[in-house]
């Protein structure tokens, strides 16, 4: 792959990563791992206003993380690529390693 193509790929990957870079968006993805949900249920579950949730959902749809369909008056969202959950499992692994390192550091400092 040429350097130009690699750079384009990295830019697109950064766009997806930016769409994940908010705690409410991560909470939404975590909730949607249980299946499709309407905006009203997502907002209630994460404890945020529907307008705020809709804005975050829009960012994630534009990044290709979520898809939606209308069911009557409701808009139903679901994970477009459930493999994103593997990414969060990896992040949890990184956090566990950090915690181990911090625990070792605390023991050294005691």
Where are these predicted regions, by residue range?
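N-terminal helix-turn-helix DNA-binding core of bacterial DNA-binding proteins
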Residues: 11-51, 74-84
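Residue-level detector of secondary-structure transition/capping positions
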Residues: 36-37, 61, 92
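Beta-hairpin "wing" of winged helix-turn-helix
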Residues: 61-71, 78
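Noncatalytic linker/hinge segments flanking ATPase motor cores
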Residues: 32, 70-73, 106-110
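Short, hydrophobic-biased segments on the C-terminal half of alpha helices
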Residues: 57-58
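Amphipathic alpha-helical dimerization/coiled-coil segments
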Residues: 1-8, 12, 84-110
């Amino acid at each position: 792959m040429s350097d130009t193509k690699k750079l384009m790929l990295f830019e697109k990957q950064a766009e997806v990563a930016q769409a994940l870079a908010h705690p409410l968006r991560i909470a939404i993805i975590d909730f949607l791992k249980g299946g499709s949900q309407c905006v009203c249920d997502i907002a209630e579950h994460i404890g945020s206003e529907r307008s705020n949730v809709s804005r975050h959902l829009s960012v994630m749809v534009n990044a290709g993380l979520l898809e939606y369909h209308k069911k009557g008056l409701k808009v139903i969202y679901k994970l477009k690529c459930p493999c994103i959950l593997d990414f969060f499992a990896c992040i949890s692994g990184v956090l566990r390693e950090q915690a181990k390192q911090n625990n070792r550091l605390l023991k050294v400092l005691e």
